[in-house]
Amino acid sequence: MELLTTVASFFTPTTLFLLLNLMIGTIVVTSRLGSGSRKHYQHHDGFGSGHAPAPLARAPSIIDRVKSINFHLYKFPHPETELFSMTAHHDIIGSDLHVYPDPNPAPLQRAPSLLDRVKSINMSYFKFPHDVTGSDPHSHSHSHLDLHPDPAPAPLQRAPSLLDRVKSINMSYFKFQQYNPEENDYAHHTEPTRFESIPTRMGRVDPIDISKFRIPEEDQPTGTGVNSQINPPGLTRAPSILERVKSIKLSSFYRSDPDLDQKQNPDPVLHEEHKHVRSKSESKKPVKKKKKALTKMTKSASEKSGFGFAGSHAEAPETVESLERRRPDTTRVERSTSFGDGEDGVDAKASDFINKFKQQLKLQRLDSILRYKEMLKAH
């Protein structure tokens, strides 16, 4: 610790200032002694000239350096004497290269313009070969190729226009082959393909069994049958939704004539559906309403059976059950729906309307299939 305190006491500002002055003084003394010994050696040395050295030259400025550039070195090459004239004016002293300008320099040549450069292009390499016989120019490309240009080249030919190039296309490659039916039939019989068993569109439509769809007499097309040949004048536009809704006959829900009902419902499946609706609606009806409806029905049946004769009153009235057996199912349903009151009658009407609408959709679907088949036959 005592050593550190003694060393730290020496690093005071006064001691540091004295140390700095001592270093500066030693540098000055050594520099003076060195310069005096150098002068002594220059005067008494045998290799020295004995004269005072020349003062140092000022470094040239940037302008002097730019002015000293000799542009004669960048002129276009002259005859063989240029290299000799350049080497003749070079004076080598030690390791320095001094270039002196030529006292009689040649005049500078003007650089060639763009037009002169374009004119200097030898177009003889790009001329088209003379092909008078119509032979392929590519086959004689090696014979016409010459590394040395012709001393007296022929005048340049005009480049072919777009029309000439189009006319030069050989269309024989694109001609269709002549059709020979005998050869094609023979090739067809000798080399059958594996696509013969695939049915066409017409073959796919023919197997459709149209007998499943029953068409009413008013919607059936005119002709001997469904499969008869029909030549329609043109394709008709498919009916819109509004036309389909308008085509639904709502008057059939309030008819009581059995003949009209038999024409509109020839399908036995629909009869079964109507029986089911009738049984369901009758099960929900009260007994009094049913009796009232049956009495009205017996009265109408007796009026129809009498036909205004006097002997009809003498006969015993038929029972309601016998009348119901003789009447078709559609008539029963419509009478029950027409004479029904309340919610039961509304349900029966709604179910009948839904059945009619489904039948119309089936008929329209069958009609579209028939039109598509006729279109395929026409094509």
Swiss-Prot record:
Keywords: Glycoprotein, Membrane, Transmembrane, Transmembrane helix
Composition-biased stretches (Basic and acidic residues): 137-149, 256-285, 322-335
Membrane topology of the entry: Single-pass membrane protein
Primary residence: membrane
Region annotation Disordered: where it falls in the sequence: 133-154, 216-238, 256-347
One BP term from GO: response to wounding
Keyword Transcription regulation: no
PANTHER family registered for this protein in UniProt: COTTON FIBER (DUF761) (PTHR33098), PATHOGEN-ASSOCIATED MOLECULAR PATTERNS-INDUCED PROTEIN A70 (PTHR33098:SF50)
Descriptive protein name: Pathogen-associated molecular patterns-induced protein A70
Organism: Arabidopsis thaliana
Protein's gene: A70
